[in-house]
């Protein structure tokens, strides 16, 4: 029997200050709403996300900001998995990115410290994390995605 390595699917926790839900005015049926939430949760790739966006807009029309935010949070989760980040937690203008200590890469942190200088603080320890200061709260999702892009 050969040993087969099974990739662990990390459940990334996201707690940021944006409205992300499906409004009743957009999808009235609870059953359809649950189906859409499930479909969004099952997205694993950018292709999956594009397909679900097309499907939602075809069935229900242009997405309101709250649904767009829900989709963007799904993108953020995917980016976190690639960057080995297990948790994103926002408190006012600070966003804390907690790394998976099993897959932690100090080279990424050094790169981030050079790029974001006065905007981040690194806290080593049993569970390393970075605190990132958002410049503009109305661009929270955009700034988080830009930060995560640099974590590759």
PLM segments and residue spans:
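Accessory helical-bundle/CTD segments and flexible terminal tails appended to RecA-like ATPase motors
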Residues: 1-152
């Amino acid at each position: 029997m050969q040993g087969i390595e099974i990739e662990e699917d990390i459940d990334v926790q996201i707690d940021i200050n944006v409205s992300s839900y499906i409004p009743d005015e957009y999808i009235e049926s609870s059953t359809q709403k649950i189906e859409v939430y499930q479909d969004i949760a099952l997205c694993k790739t950018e292709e999956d996300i594009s397909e679900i966006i097309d499907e939602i807009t075809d069935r229900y029309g242009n997405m309101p900001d709250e649904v767009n935010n829900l989709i963007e949070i799904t993108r953020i989760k995917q980016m976190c998995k690639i960057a080995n980040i297990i948790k994103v937690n926002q408190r006012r203008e600070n966003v804390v990115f907690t790394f998976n200590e099993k897959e932690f890469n100090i080279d990424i942190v050094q790169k981030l410290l050079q790029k974001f200088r006065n905007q981040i603080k690194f806290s080593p320890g049993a569970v390393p994390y970075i605190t990132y200061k958002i410049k503009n709260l109305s661009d929270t999702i955009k700034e988080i995605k830009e930060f995560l892009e640099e974590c590759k």
